[in-house]
């Protein structure tokens, strides 16, 4: 590698293969003079034996000096390698630190969010537990209320019965009281009174009282506070219930005074508010919380109802007693003579009393119409007793009763019962309050337990977080201590970077291990390159060593020769220095003793960048870049021995000589003519890809030119394809060879028919936009429109249909070596699943439309001849083809059998059989409107007449016909990251999408070959599209060619003659698009992880670049032989230095061959142009590479021949570096024909020029016609490596090259346009 570098950077090799050093030449001169003196004094015989020894000594001495020189070169290279490794390590360390900081921030945010979510989950769980507890309590309360309601109904019935009995007893008690008051009257009345008592038993309670005696009725029933005396029989039944109610273990909270009064008053009236059982008491408290007022409202309502019922009861009783007294007094006088039993039965008004009591009963019943069956039943039993018993029994009972003692006993019982009821009610109230309190405390206990658990968990989390914070604090203190120590260490700027303590032992071990691995790989690569170059040099220059050995002999041989001619001194090298104030280039002579003088002279300069401090953070990144660009500027200005012209750094071979050859070379240099951001309005747009527009083609299959809606023909008879085929078959092989060579030359010319329009794809984070410009006036944007919401990764210009395109329907007719496997179409109208049947790796994909089946094919039984089902619509479709296009029927002839048959069996082995499948809808007129948008093709466009759109209101019929032929003309194909493929017209109506389809993976590259478009997908397959029989592109039917498994992306493709080279991992696959098969595959790099990224074809060579590699590889286009390796990394490192910007770490991002130059764009914005050497690399081996004869390459699979042109060798010794570059990677190169400035004004309009170059530019060569080409470079930002950041924005590249002064504009996407004059070949 060092030997090659020495050759690369050497000024001129001179006439001999090696030049003696100055010391050896001095010694040789002195010895030569001494030998002359000896010969003059003595004779030649004296020095004949001595001279070989002296020559051997001098040769050894010269070789020692040469080895010493080589060792110094190797030492410098090793220092550069060490410097590169250190730079790479610093950059990787900074990137890793930045990534770790981002990761820590992301982890903290995720942890905080996780803690918040956990807190929310815990709170929701606590609320859920509380709600479940409440729901359980409500369910218990409902069940207790239901039980209480049932018991209250039972209790009400028993109380109602007792209430009726107590009314009777109360009436008897009133009668006895009145009789006791009247006992002091006369004896006669007492006798009559005793007789009346015998006639009217006391048990009936119907004694004749005066009408006014009803006013003496006590008011005990009218008072709500007095307990009722009717409970004297209820005591026995109610007492056990009170004992039962006291057994409840729950204790509610204390009641209110209103509740006590309500319950006491209700119980005294014998209403519904009687003694409640234990279940009722439980339900009262547990169901209703202490703060709810529902219980008070209900009790108030019941109280009001009972009070009204009570007043009505008292009124009814008074009326009833008065009526009974009057009836008894009136009837007693009339019926004294009747018998006692009969008188009692007849005079008893019980039926009337029943009616009254039934009315009373209906008004006083609190339970909505429950009949008092107990009252009726007791009344009936009373009548039965009276009717069946005799008067003697009744009299005995009445006479034996002690009315006065009985009343006092009843009063005592009533009073005692009242006290017991009050005690029981008070106990029930206390019990209910205690039960409610227990329930409330239970709920609070559960809630507090949940809160306690949450607090415990929070405590644990806080403890963990506290430990984490303590750990972080400890780390922060350690980092702060390290930072302080680092600041102290940084103050000692004299200490070199390599000696500072910055790493731990583990990091240092890892770095050393990685360094050793990189070093080992580097040494292996250097050894391989050195060995290859040595072998090539020895093979190409076999006489070099002989020249080196005979140079000293030649020097001393003059002693014995008669000629005394002195050797000519080599011309000193010319160094053109640019003087900025005068804009002139002045030659200067400078002696250079060795190759080392071209390398950096200051040995410490390799560590200039590393001696800087690295304390700049992200905020000061811009200032750091400015400083680095300043140092690049200083490095560029230090470089001597190179010519600077037109913004390029040229090698010294461009020195001015008398014959004017250098002037011609200077004249053909690229001249920068335009430099500006792509879009002044939108600064967020990023460049992605671009392509020049090819407006050629647009002809029908039979040679007709499409103009508007008409088709014109030059000579119809002469364009008969079948006749031409027959004539070509009858020609001799020599004429056939000549014709094929002419066709190849015609294809080369068609490929160069480009317009000056350029489509540029720019993207933001959400949308992709297409900007159309004219390279002649790149500042004027012709149009811009949005394509889709995904990134457009590639774009290709597809010319219109040509008569030289492969005919549709004959793709597999000539490939006899194709595997005869079964072929099946994949999507029928009833099934959406793809049926993969491979034909040499080919899958046919069809997208059927509604009403049109896409020729569904099924594998045959024998596996050799598939059955192709023809849709019945094909007969009607073919009849609609225009008569002016006869080849449309010829293209479908192979697919049709008989017109009346619907199925046809085709043998693949038969020649001429079209086995893809039937193209449906030839003219595009039967596509329904409700198609899926993925496969729907929009063929609408305007009428094309000489590339000018006609107004919509003109020629409606012609416009309708022209819409069908829209994709016959030149189109632009755009491939998006989401797998969508868009086809736009490149003639007019650019915004309108003619066709679109969604493929199964991202689209990475698109190429066109003779009417076939190949689309590379990220899953390792090629989608192959053809034109339909009408000449339009048919996106609904295509082939898929699988390059192998496992699937990897196809990164790049290029057209090489009539084949396509595909970059697939580290391999290159050569695909024959017509036969749709893989012809050849070979490794471009030994490692599988090294992917092929760019391919550039010219002549008989293809230049290949590898991912993350700075070496370009040249392969032969026909023999696939590896011809040359060119490493651009040493050149870039030499020109720009090896600073922290990483110019030494070169990766190639853009590659193009144009204007007999190899254009290389790198990942750090450097642009290199390397002139190609069309002739052979050396003339020493004329047998291997013939010069004047025409080389012809044959195809092993067919009789086709291809003319050999030239092999595009190049040498880094001739490389030219552009000082105009980008801040980021170079995205693309585009070359289109055009002329911005005239060749006469190119010297004056350029930014850097020379006097002689300017004068030579004004004299165009009359021998070779020159063609002007515009080369466009696109990338992020702009930088002038001579000016750095401070002056790069203010420099003007002529009048048409204004640069915006703001820094933000300098970082936008920029276009750089050069004009190159190249020969018309």
Swiss-Prot record:
UniProt domain RH1: residue ranges: 7-95
Keywords: Acetylation, Coiled coil, Cytoplasm, Lysosome, Membrane, Phosphoprotein
Modified residues (N-acetylmethionine): 1
Compositionally biased intervals (Acidic residues): 874-883
Biased composition (Polar residues): 236-248, 266-285, 322-332, 855-864, 1255-1266
MF (Gene Ontology): identical protein binding; JUN kinase binding; kinesin binding; MAP-kinase scaffold activity; mitogen-activated protein kinase p38 binding
PTM-bearing positions, type Phosphothreonine: 217, 292, 348, 365, 418, 586, 595, 1264
Annotated coiled-coil segments of the chain: 66-166, 408-534, 724-758
Location of the protein in the cell: Cytoplasm; Cytoplasm, Perinuclear region; Lysosome membrane
Modified residues (Phosphoserine): 109, 183, 185, 194, 203, 238, 251, 265, 268, 272, 311, 329, 332, 347, 588, 705, 728, 730, 732-733, 1188
Domain RH2 per the UniProt entry, residue ranges: 500-604
Entry-linked InterPro entries: JIP3/JIP4 (IPR039911), JIP_LZII (IPR032486), RH1 (IPR034743), RH2 (IPR034744), WD40/YVTN_repeat-like_dom_sf (IPR015943), WD40_repeat_dom_sf (IPR036322)
Biased composition (Basic and acidic residues): 473-489
Residues spanning the signal sequence: none
PTM note: Phosphorylated by MAPK8 and MAPK14.
SUPFAM superfamilies, alphabetized: WD40 repeat-like (SSF50978)
The protein's name: C-Jun-amino-terminal kinase-interacting protein 4
Organism: Mus musculus (Mouse)
């Amino acid at each position: 590698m060092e030997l090659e570098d020495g050759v690369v950077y050497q000024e001129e090799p001179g006439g001999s293969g090696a030049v003696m050093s100055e010391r050896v030449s001095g010694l040789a001169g002195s010895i030569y003079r001494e030998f002359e003196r000896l010969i003059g004094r003595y004779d030649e015989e004296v020095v004949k034996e001595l001279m070989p020894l002296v020559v051997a000594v001098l040769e050894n001495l010269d070789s020692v000096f040469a080895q010493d020189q080589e060792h110094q070169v190797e030492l410098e290279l090793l220092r550069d390698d060490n410097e590169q490794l250190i730079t790479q390590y610093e950059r990787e360390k900074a990137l890793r630190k930045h990534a770790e900081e981002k990761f820590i921030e992301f982890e903290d945010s995720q942890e905080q969010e996780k803690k918040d979510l956990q807190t929310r989950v815990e709170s929701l769980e606590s609320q859920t537990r509380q709600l479940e507890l409440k729901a359980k309590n409500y369910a218990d309360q409902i069940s207790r209320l239901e039980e209480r309601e049932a018991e209250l109904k039972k209790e009400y019935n028993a109380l109602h019965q007792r209430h009726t009995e107590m009314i009777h007893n109360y009436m008897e008690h009133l009668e006895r009281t009145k009789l006791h008051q009247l006992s002091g009257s006369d004896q006669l009345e007492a006798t009559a009174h005793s007789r009346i008592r015998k006639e009217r038993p006391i048990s009936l309670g119907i004694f004749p009282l005066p009408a006014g005696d009803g006013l003496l009725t006590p008011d005990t029933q009218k008072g709500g506070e007095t307990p009722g005396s009717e409970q004297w029989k209820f005591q026995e039944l109610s007492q056990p219930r009170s004992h039962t109610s006291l057994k409840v273990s729950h204790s509610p909270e204390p009641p209110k005074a209103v509740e006590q009064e309500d319950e006491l008053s209700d119980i005294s009236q014998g209403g519904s508010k009687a003694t409640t059982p234990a279940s009722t008491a439980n339900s009262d408290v547990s169901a209703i919380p202490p703060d709810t007022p529902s219980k008070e409202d209900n009790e108030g309502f019941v109280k009001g109802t009972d009070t009204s019922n009570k007043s009505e009861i008292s009124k009814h009783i008074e009326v009833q007693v008065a009526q009974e007294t009057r009836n008894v007094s009136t009837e007693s006088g009339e019926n004294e003579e009747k018998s006692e039993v009969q008188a009692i039965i007849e005079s008893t008004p019980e039926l009337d009393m029943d009616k009254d009591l039934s009315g009373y009963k209906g008004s006083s019943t609190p339970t909505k119409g429950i009949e008092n069956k107990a009252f009726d039943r007791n009344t009936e039993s009373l009548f039965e007793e009276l009717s069946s018993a005799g008067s003697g029994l009744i009299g005995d009972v009445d006479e034996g009763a002690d009315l006065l003692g009985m009343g006092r006993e009843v009063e005592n019982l009533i009073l005692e019962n009242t006290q017991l009821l009050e005690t029981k009610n008070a106990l029930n109230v206390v019990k209910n309050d205690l039960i409610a309190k227990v329930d409330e405390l239970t709920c609070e206990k559960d809630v507090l337990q949940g809160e306690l658990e949450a607090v415990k968990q929070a405590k644990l989390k806080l403890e963990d977080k506290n430990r984490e914070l303590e750990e972080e604090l400890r780390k922060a203190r350690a980092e702060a201590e390290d930072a302080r120590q680092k600041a102290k260490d940084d103050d000692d700027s004299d200490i070199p970077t390599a000696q500072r303590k910055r790493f731990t032992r583990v990091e240092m071990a890892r770095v050393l291990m990685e360094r050793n691995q990189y070093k080992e790989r580097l040494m292996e690569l250097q050894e391989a390159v050195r060995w290859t170059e040595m072998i090539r040099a020895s093979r190409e220059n076999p006489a070099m060593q002989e020249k080196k050995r005979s140079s000293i002999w030649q020097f001393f041989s003059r002693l014995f020769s008669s000629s005394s001619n002195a050797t000519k001194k080599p011309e000193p090298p010319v160094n053109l220095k640019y003087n900025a104030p005068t804009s002139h280039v002045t030659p200067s002579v400078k002696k250079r003793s060795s190759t080392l003088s071209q390398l950096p002279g200051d040995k410490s300069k390799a560590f200039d960048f590393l001696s800087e401090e690295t304390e700049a953070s992200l905020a000061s990144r811009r200032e750091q870049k400015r400083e680095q660009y300043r140092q690049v500027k200083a490095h560029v200005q230090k470089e001597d021995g190179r010519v600077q012209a037109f913004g390029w750094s040229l090698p010294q071979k461009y020195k001015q000589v008398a014959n004017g050859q250098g002037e011609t070379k200077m004249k053909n240099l690229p001249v920068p003519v335009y430099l500006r951001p792509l879009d002044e309005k939108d600064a967020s747009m990023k460049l992605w890809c671009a392509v020049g527009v090819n407006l050629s083609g647009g002809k029908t299959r039979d040679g007709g030119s499409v103009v508007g809606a008409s088709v014109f023909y030059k000579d119809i008879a002469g364009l008969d394809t079948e006749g031409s085929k027959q004539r070509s078959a009858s020609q001799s092989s020599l004429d056939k060879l000549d014709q094929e060579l002419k066709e190849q030359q015609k294809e080369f010319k068609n490929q160069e028919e480009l317009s000056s329009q350029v489509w540029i794809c720019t993207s933001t984070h959400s949308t992709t936009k297409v900007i159309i410009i004219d390279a002649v006036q790149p500042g004027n944007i012709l149009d811009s429109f949005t394509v889709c919401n995904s990134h457009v990764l590639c774009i290709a210009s597809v010319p219109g249909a040509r008569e030289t395109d492969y005919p549709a329907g004959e793709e597999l007719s000539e490939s006899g070596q194709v595997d005869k496997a079964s072929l099946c179409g994949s999507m029928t109208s009833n099934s959406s699943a793809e049926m993969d049947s491979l034909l040499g790796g080919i899958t046919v994909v069809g997208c059927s439309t509604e009403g049109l089946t896409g020729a569904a094919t099924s594998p045959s039984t024998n596996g050799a001849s598939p059955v192709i089902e023809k849709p019945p619509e094909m007969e009607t479709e073919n009849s609609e083809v225009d008569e002016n296009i006869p080849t449309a029927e010829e293209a479908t002839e192979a697919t049709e059998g008989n017109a009346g048959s619907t199925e046809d069996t085709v043998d693949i082995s038969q020649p001429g059989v079209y086995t893809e499948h039937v193209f449906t809808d030839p003219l595009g007129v039967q596509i329904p409107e409700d198609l899926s948008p993925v496969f729907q093709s929009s063929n609408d466009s305007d009428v094309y007449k000489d590339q000018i759109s006609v107004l919509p209101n003109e020629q409606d019929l012609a416009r309708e016909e022209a819409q069908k032929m829209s994709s016959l003309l030149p189109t632009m194909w755009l491939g998006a990251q989401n797998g969508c493929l868009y086809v736009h017209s490149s003639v007019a109506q650019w915004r309108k999408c003619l066709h679109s389809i969604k493929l199964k993976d991202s689209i990475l590259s698109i190429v066109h070959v003779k009417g076939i478009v190949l689309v590379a997908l990220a899953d390792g397959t090629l989608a192959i599209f053809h034109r339909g029989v009408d000449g339009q592109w048919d996106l609904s039917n295509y082939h898929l060619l699988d390059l192998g498994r496992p699937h990897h992306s196809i990164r790049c493709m290029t057209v090489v003659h009539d084949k396509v080279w595909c970059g697939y991992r580290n391999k290159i696959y050569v695909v024959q698009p017509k036969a749709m098969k893989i012809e050849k595959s070979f490794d471009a790099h030994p490692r599988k992880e090294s992917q092929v990224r760019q391919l550039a074809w010219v002549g008989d060579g293809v230049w290949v670049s590898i991912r993350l590699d700075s070496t370009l590889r040249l392969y032969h286009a026909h023999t696939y032989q590896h011809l040359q390796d060119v490493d651009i990394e040493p050149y870039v490192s030499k020109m720009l230095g090896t600073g922290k910007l990483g110019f030494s770490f070169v990766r190639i991002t853009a590659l193009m061959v144009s204007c007999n130059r190899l254009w290389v764009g790198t990942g750090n914005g450097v642009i290199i142009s390397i002139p190609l050497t069309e002739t052979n690399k050396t003339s020493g081996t004329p047998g291997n590479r013939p010069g004047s004869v025409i080389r012809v390459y044959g195809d092993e699979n067919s009789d086709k021949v291809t003319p050999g042109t030239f092999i595009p060798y190049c040498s880094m010794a001739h490389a030219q570096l552009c000082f105009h570059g980008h801040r980021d990677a170079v995205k693309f190169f585009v070359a289109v024909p055009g002329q911005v400035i005239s060749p006469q004004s190119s010297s004056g309009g350029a930014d850097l020029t020379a006097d002689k170059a300017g004068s030579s530019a004004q004299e165009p060569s009359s021998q070779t016609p020159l063609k002007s080409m515009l080369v466009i470079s696109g990338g992020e930002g702009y930088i002038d490596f001579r000016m750095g950041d401070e002056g790069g924005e203010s420099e003007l590249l002529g009048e048409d090259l204004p640069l915006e002064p703001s820094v933000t504009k300098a970082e936008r996407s920029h276009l750089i346009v050069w004009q190159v004059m190249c020969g018309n070949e």
